[in-house]
Amino acid sequence: MDELAGGGGGQGMAVPPRPQQGPGGNLSLPPGANGAPGGGGPPAAETAGPPAGPELSRPQQYTIPGILHYIQHEWARFEMERAHWEVERAELQARIAFLQGERKGQENLKKDLVRRIKMLEYALKQERAKYHKLKYGTELNQGDLKMPTFESEETKDAEAPPAQNSQLTWKQGRQLLRQYLQEVGYTDTILDVRSQRVRSLLGLSNSEPNGSIEAKNLEQILNGGESPKQKGQEIKRPSGDVLETFNFLENADDSDEEENDMIEGIPEGKDKLRIHKHKIGNEGLAADLTDDPDTEEALKEFDFLVTAEDGEGAGEARSSGDGTEWDKDDLSPTAEVWDVDQGLMSKLKEQYKKERKGKRGAKRVNRTNLCDMITDLGDDELPHIPSGIINQSRSASTRMTDHEGSRAEEAEPITFPSGGGKSFIMGSDDVLLSVLGLGDLADLTVTNDADYSYDLPANKDALRKTWNPKYTLRSHFDGVRALAFHPVEPVLVTASEDHTLKLWNLQKTVPAKKSASLDVEPIYTFRAHIGPVLSLAISSNGEQCFSGGIDATIQWWNMPSPNVDPYDTYESHVLAGTLVAHTDAVWGLAYSGIKNQLLSCSADGTIRLWNPQEKLPCICTYNGDKEHGIPTSVDFIGCDPAHMVTSFNTGSAIIYDLETSQSLVMLSSQVDSGLQSSNHINRVVSHPTLPVTITAHEDRHIKFFDNKTGKMIHSMVAHLDAVTSLAVDPNGIYLMSGSHDCSIRLWNLDSKTCVQEITAHRKKLDESIYDVAFHPSKAYIASAGADALAKVFV
């Protein structure tokens, strides 16, 4: 192929007779043989040789610039696609690495949680065994109580290196650790102190040489052959010695050389047998502890369990286990003897005690409980707990303010102990549980375990829960002033300012549109009042209910069936009668099922006792001359139904004898009984089982009074606004309060602490919650608000 130079048409590579494609896309003919430039015009065409017609139908040829341009374009596209591919590949690799790491993290988390669960189960079994022994004096048969085993440790045991290499590596590591400890100033004298603690724990005197203990006594200590007399002596040891034992157990991992030195007198066969037993029981958990940092970290979190467990006496705890603490160090491959400098050791001991005193408060959470346990074990017997009434806690006065404490001591009241005794709510067994300081472990359970009856109240655990809104009752047109539950059925009655009462069956629900709660439609509406309904009471059998209104009447109703048809015809027999005697609004009602009597208090200043079944239902009238003011609330005394308590707008509350109509005790919060408080009382309730009265005040306070002396035993600011309503659960464990700050608060009557706060209603005209109630037999609570809603919580 010849290379020809072209003129205006450019260069071309082609057979001379064929046309060629220039860079610009124009066809050009090759120049003549004489090298004259071909202009691509007609003269050049004439000299081209063959005619042009058949030449145009042949395939077009490419020029070098066009080919280079195409190659460069394709190469750029290929490089771009390759770059995109590499980016996608890197992203996918990063995604794969992230998912692998996430999977590995989840597996590690799962293993750690499984390990913790096993350790918690093991610790709980130990605590139950100790509790059973402390309560009944006998060992609890739980089978072979073994430390939990983990898969990683089993594989490590299976792949154990030869003993000689392991011993050599262990020696080198120990020497390196000694060098590091010397560099940071942690000398052998500290180890000497640790050695001395081991000797004191074994009962050896300081003057005895190392290894001089008799083999028989040592074997008895190590293998658990301890007599009951020795156990009793250990329980009566001074608390200081036991606390030293706790300090040792907190900080020291036992010295392997000292342990091996002390068991030299044990026969070889028994030693091997004991080591074999250790391996079976623990599966290398203690021996390979340093090889598995996760296991070591998990075990460190349970140091407080070891401390509490060894509180009964270090010797007893050492001798009664499976030999874990001793056998762990028996596996050490070497043994050394440390010389103890008694003078230096005693100085370091004193210095250590001083340091521990400074750290003791923040070091151990359960330290106080352990000290209380030691003190209680030193006494001849546990504090006596009276069987019907609460006992006084030794630490109750220290938990109160000086002012309130002085009042409590004057009145000798039935206090709510918040300390060691805790016998207001709990029985003697719960006192023992709190003394042991189990903390959260006391609530843990292990499946397939023996069920020990601790004589706890039946409904105590049922109430230890979080209440959540479940039902919303929306059919009233004005504020809901009062509500009450049926004694047995899941049925609620509400009284409203819209002049009506409504009956609700909580089992007939309608799903709400935009809420997790359920709407309930009323199944019956009571209509007889000609004004707002202010108060409500239901009989103990649930067959009648009573309502008091601003029209000064008390309406007596027969309760319809919970399964009544809401669209049934009107039944006139539902309204059983009307009790007329008051001349102003009836603000409070209370019913007693013992004598089927009804109490009412009115704005006319009187409190009236009714027996609705009689022809003249009004039995007696109290405070007829308004000598104490205007009554605001009334209730029967729970532990003495022959008495009732009434609160007044003057800030005082009076206990009346229903038989004699005489006032017995005035409950006043003032130090000087001649002065009366101006704090308006909105609600008064009586504790169901104790001689205690609780009042809710306009000044945001809730106050507790002793019914026998009339003295206030506790006072607390309970809400951010006026406290309007109170309710005590049927077991007397919890108190519920409602306020105009839109919140419901649940209080533990033992500790006077708020267990839960619920924001339930909205404000309307600066008022929010009017009433709260517990269901007598089911897990329901309810609240009534000024926003025309009633809410039920489960």
From Swiss-Prot:
Region feature Disordered, mapped onto this chain: 1-59, 309-339
Region described as Calmodulin-binding: 164-181
Cell location: Cytoplasm; Membrane
Positions of post-translational Phosphothreonine modification: T149
Main location: cytoplasm
BP terms from Gene Ontology: negative regulation of DNA-templated transcription; negative regulation of hippo signaling; negative regulation of intracellular estrogen receptor signaling pathway; response to estradiol
Annotated GO CC locations: dendrite; FAR/SIN/STRIPAK complex; Golgi apparatus; neuronal cell body; nucleoplasm; plasma membrane; postsynapse; protein-containing complex
Extent of Gly residues compositional bias: 1-12
Keyword field contains Cell cycle: no
Function recorded in the entry: Calmodulin-binding scaffolding protein which is the center of the striatin-interacting phosphatase and kinase (STRIPAK) complexes. STRIPAK complexes have critical roles in protein (de)phosphorylation and are regulators of multiple signaling pathways including Hippo, MAPK, nuclear receptor and cytoskeleton remodeling. Different types of STRIPAK complexes are involved in a variety of biological processes such as cell growth, differentiation, apoptosis, metabolism and immune regulation.
PANTHER family (UniProt xref): STRIATIN, STRIATIN-3
Family: Belongs to the WD repeat striatin family.
Self-association state and partner proteins as the record states: Tetramerizes. Part of the core of STRIPAK complexes composed of PP2A catalytic and scaffolding subunits, the striatins (PP2A regulatory subunits), the striatin-associated proteins MOB4, STRIP1 and STRIP2, PDCD10 and members of the STE20 kinases, such as STK24 and STK26. The STRIPAK complex can be extended by adapter proteins such as SLMAP:SIKE1 or CTTNBP2NL. Interacts with CDC42BPB.
Protein name: Striatin-3
Organism in which the protein naturally occurs: Rattus norvegicus
Gene that encodes it: Strn3
